[in-house]
Amino acid sequence: MNYSFDHIRLFIAIDYSLESVGVTMFDVEKKQYHFLSYLNIKKPATASRAAMLRGIDDLTVVEYQRDPIATVKSREDGLFGWEQQHMTNVLHYNAELVRSINRVASHLIQNLQKRETCVLIENYSYSSQSDTLIQLVENTMEVKHHLLTSTCNMENFYCIPAPRVKLYVGKGNYDKYDMTTAFLGNVRSDDYIPRSSFYQYLLQNFHEHYLKERIKKGKQFNEVLSPISDVVDSYWILRYFLVLNELD
């Protein structure tokens, strides 16, 4: 890209999902990471995992509770009631997500300006088809609106294709387990990540607390439990962009 990032003081990368959003921030001057998880803790198991993450100095966990995402087909109150609740969620929770990002950013860097902030968000997978796809698009658009209003300028806003990030990390068919083990192994030789308290915590606790073996269609696979997978994915979005633009 023929664009100067000399004025950027903070990079923010976002991996968005409907129940767990992962965010990685990088302070350019201090060469330090800060991570954020915006997490629906309605399920007790998720709440327990969130509690274990408290006290990590470079990880902020913002907890909220709402009923799990449901499709129109599974709702008994019909389209009108479902749509009203859905739009209430879209407007409220995404505004709070961006407020949380801005609070952390302003704490990391005093007097941070919009023009000094670069935001990266994972692009849609246009081949995806699911009952929640439209919900994801509507939610993400609201996030983008708030980010461009209060966090960064349009010229510092980028959508990053997930396949390119996966290829950068290793292979295009990498799943969340592959991405997380690559993160823990520091496969791209990031000089700054070993300093991170979150990284060191995960090195010690990942296999015991955040990995679960499951069977799907008769095959065993390793599931990385939220919010870890989302935070790690946001880290790789950021690293891909920094390396692509020779900013690391």
Q: What residues fall within each predicted segment?
A:
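Phosphate- and other anionic-substrate recognition elements at nucleic-acid/protein interfaces
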Residues: 1-248
